[in-house]
């Protein structure tokens, strides 16, 4: 059964990966938005992390992972359609993850002293049947890159501990640790306890290996810092992770993104990630010092200390937990429940969730008539998908906990995207009125079907015509509007 599933599950995963679902804004704005601005010269949304005054994100991981692919798409394949670019990126992410899994997982499973192919295959089946693999890992999250880098470092650690590591692996270990840290500041949290184990076991046996890794880390970090300083065109040295750490240590900053109880990772996110898979984990008392388990403990301990805790921050734990499973044949009923759980989550997160946003932008592009697009009660529209080099992007601002329209450029009447996020309906009315005052005759309003009653109220003042509707689109943020209304995304023409 395992061998058949190992071939079948990647095929299913690839189909899901190519769906236009939209899980979180960061999958676009922290990666693809900046890459499209740099490589294709579009006008888009620069997230706060990449603003020159903040420089809290490193460009190096983006260019290292995606740079060659973007050169290929732009200069050789001549890919211009944003939807095709998105599909290529997701295909690339999925195949890269599979390649790293097939390389690293056997080492991590065997690190648990389980020297047989059946264990490796079952660990692969567990990962490949997880909705996290299908829905999150193929999307362009920095967390997805973090997972890949972590697997590579831990696989190198197993070789170091078993005296199989050569010079190339030692040098690459230092490089990968440096890149991982500049990819996400959470990366060291996954590595701290495993690194301590490696350090203590190797220090007196082959201390020169630690020196090689340290030198490699130092040189790699210097190169990355120089690259980021160049990209930000700064006169001062830019150390992006340091800026990010300082930002995240300020609770007031975290409050802008949402504060969570410190038990959220352990009691909410882990069950959401693993579901019934938690019941498939064997007794690990004899494996306390194995690298995957140490990495899990290390990450949960340190990441739970922070007040902002999102599910995607724990993406790397899926392949780590796969090394701690009991054999499927001992609990076949649990494995079936696991498959049902992941199929359901896949449909919700991999197909339906905010699934109308990307097709809607694609439809608007096909009309080749962009005046003013107002998005309301959806995730922020990935403006890179407009593929527009003269685009103006406006959004709301918050002053003294009051949301306002001070940053919206009402004098811009064409090629203008306005993201009103989840503001009150009164602010939507104010925005439309301000555009009317500035001489705008009509505009687009894109809203989920859960806002139908508000559209009806708007129709009492303006002529509102439904132009288009996209399905599937699941709006989980407004469940109070009724199950029948949370499906679908609609485009309206508002004549002023």
UniProtKB/Swiss-Prot annotation:
Q: Does the keyword Glycoprotein apply?
A: yes
Membrane topology per the entry is: Multi-pass membrane protein
The cellular location(s) given in this protein's UniProt record come to: Endoplasmic reticulum membrane
| Pathway(s) where this gene product acts | Glycolipid biosynthesis; glycosylphosphatidylinositol-anchor biosynthesis
One of its GO biological process terms is: GPI anchor biosynthetic process
Q: Which UniProt keywords apply?
A: Endoplasmic reticulum, Glycoprotein, Glycosyltransferase, GPI-anchor biosynthesis, Membrane, Transferase, Transmembrane, Transmembrane helix
Q: Known EC number(s)?
A: 2.4.1.-
The record's function comment reads: Alpha-1,2-mannosyltransferase involved in glycosylphosphatidylinositol-anchor biosynthesis. Transfers a fourth mannose to trimannosyl-GPIs during GPI precursor assembly. The presence of a fourth mannose in GPI is essential in fungi.
Q: Which family does it belong to?
A: Belongs to the glycosyltransferase 22 family. PIGZ subfamily.
**Protein name as annotated:** GPI mannosyltransferase 4
**The organism's lineage?**
Eukaryota, Fungi, Dikarya, Ascomycota, Saccharomycotina
């Amino acid at each position: 059964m395992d061998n058949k599933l190992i071939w079948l599950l990647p095929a299913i995963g690839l189909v899901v990966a190519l769906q236009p679902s939209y899980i979180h804004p960061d999958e676009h704005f922290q990666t693809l938005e900046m890459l499209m601005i740099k490589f294709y010269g579009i006008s888009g949304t620069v997230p706060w992390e990449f603003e020159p005054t903040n420089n809290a994100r490193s460009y190096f991981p983006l260019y290292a992972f995606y740079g060659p692919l973007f050169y290929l798409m732009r200069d050789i394949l001549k890919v211009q359609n944003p939807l095709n670019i998105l599909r290529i990126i997701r295909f690339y992410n999925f195949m890269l993850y599979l390649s790293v899994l097939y390389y690293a997982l056997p080492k991590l499973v065997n690190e648990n002293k389980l020297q047989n192919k059946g264990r490796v295959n079952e660990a692969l089946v567990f990962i490949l049947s997880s909705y996290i693999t299908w829905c999150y890992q193929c999307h362009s999250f920095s967390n997805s890159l973090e997972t890949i880098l972590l697997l590579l470092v831990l696989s190198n650690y197993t070789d170091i501990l078993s005296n199989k590591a050569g010079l190339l692996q030692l040098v690459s270990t230092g490089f990968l640790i440096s890149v991982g840290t500049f990819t996400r500041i959470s990366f060291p949290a996954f590595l701290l306890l495993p690194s301590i184990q490696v350090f203590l076991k190797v220090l007196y046996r082959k201390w020169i290996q630690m020196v090689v890794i340290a030198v490699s880390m130092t040189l790699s970090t210097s190169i990355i810092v120089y690259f980021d300083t160049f990209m930000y065109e700064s006169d001062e040295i830019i150390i992006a992770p340091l800026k990010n750490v300082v930002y995240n240590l300020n609770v007031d900053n975290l409050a802008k993104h949402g504060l969570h109880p410190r038990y959220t990772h352990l009691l909410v996110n882990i069950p959401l990630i693993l579901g019934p898979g938690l019941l498939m984990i064997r007794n690990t008392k004899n494996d306390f010092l194995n690298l995957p388990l140490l990495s899990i403990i290390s990450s949960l301990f340190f990441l739970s200390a922070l007040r902002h805790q999102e599910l995607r921050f724990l993406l790397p734990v899926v392949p780590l937990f796969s090394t701690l499973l009991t054999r499927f044949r001992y609990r076949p009923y649990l494995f079936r429940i696991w498959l049902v759980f992941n199929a359901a989550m896949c449909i919700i997160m991999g197909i339906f969730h905010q699934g109308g946003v990307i097709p809607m932008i694609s439809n608007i592009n096909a009309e080749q008539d962009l005046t003013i697009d107002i998005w309301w009660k959806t995730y922020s529209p990935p403006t890179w998908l407009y593929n527009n080099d003269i685009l103006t992007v406006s959004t709301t601002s918050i002053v003294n906990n009051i949301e306002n329209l001070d940053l919206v450029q009402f004098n811009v009447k064409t090629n203008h995207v306005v993201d009103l996020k989840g503001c009150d309906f009164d602010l939507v009315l104010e925005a439309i009125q301000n555009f009317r005052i500035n001489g705008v005759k009509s505009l687009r309003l894109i809203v989920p079907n859960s806002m139908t009653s508000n559209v009806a109220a708007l129709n009492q003042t303006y002529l509102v015509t439904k132009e288009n509707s996209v399905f599937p689109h699941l709006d989980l943020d407004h469940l109070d509007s009724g199950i029948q209304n949370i499906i679908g995304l609609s485009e309206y023409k508002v004549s002023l």
